[in-house]
Amino acid sequence: MAETNPELSDLMAQTNKKIVPKFTEIFPVEDVNYPYSAFIASVRKDVIKHCTDHKGIFQPVLPPEKKVPELWFYTELKTRTSSITLAIRMDNLYLVGFRTPGGVWWEFGKAGDTHLLGDNPRWLGFGGRYQDLIGNKGLETVTMGRAEMTRAVNDLAKKKKMATLEEEEVQMQMQMPEAAELAAAAAAADPQADTKSKLVKLVVMVCEGLRFNTVSRTVDAGFNSQHGVTLTVTQGKQVQKWDRISKAAFEWADHPTAVIPDMQKLGIKDKNEAARIVALVKNQTTAAAAAATAASADNDDDEA
């Protein structure tokens, strides 16, 4: 008899498992009396309850990352006319998907992938990496702010189906006589571009705002600006290296004076500078190692 793959079994079970978030934070996006900074501070405070302290690391360390996430939280972004709920992993602060007012969950990924969300989610048709969302552009090209978040929420809340390139071409063929020429032009376009643009704004403002002190401060400073706000080129590069900065924090915990070349390229010379930039550190221990440590502690009465 073939042995079952525990990870695969867990993933399959997750498909039918209803997520119970540890908390839900509501942000009234258009309320100018409710600062973005207060929203981020409140979510961070709740996330930190599930973090641990690590000797030599100034920042709270997130729970160990697992193949099948166990800890989740929701953020409900509400405008005057609509709302969406973001499902975010506690172990790495990744946005996995969002729920519309109609109760439909949209998840990053495509047919053939394994769902992490319950309640019969639908695939967005693309992944959640920055490469998937903005291609080779830098994060300094992403405009954010209260108005941008409002538009993103209102537009995403209306999403009812995944627009595919084929669907776009068929619609044009039915509506316009010069369809052949237009369809050829459409083939070079991305019918999901607008959805991706809205989602990347929310990913940076919410997820990166939680991870990075620099991001939350920058966004907060220009959140009410009519022209929006953007990150600097350096901040954008740091955001895309959050995992590596987290690894460096663990390295500096063991070797405080270590010189880490790739951190110097990001303008981060030591753990003090890293703590100024990063608010929450990704756990660098594997789930297996964490389980082994826990088992060892359970079997040893002298363990603290």
Swiss-Prot record:
Catalysed reactions, semicolon-separated: Endohydrolysis of the N-glycosidic bond at one specific adenosine on the 28S rRNA
Stated name of the protein: Ribosome-inactivating protein 9
Lineage of the species this protein comes from: Eukaryota, Viridiplantae, Streptophyta, Embryophyta, Tracheophyta
GO molecular function, one term: rRNA N-glycosylase activity
Keyword Nucleus in annotation: no
Keyword tags: Cytoplasm, Hydrolase, Plant defense, Protein synthesis inhibitor, Toxin
UniProt main location, coarse: cytoplasm
Gene3D superfamilies: Ricin (A subunit), domain 1 (3.40.420.10), Ricin (A Subunit), domain 2 (4.10.470.10)
Location of the active site: 208
Enzyme superclass (EC): hydrolase
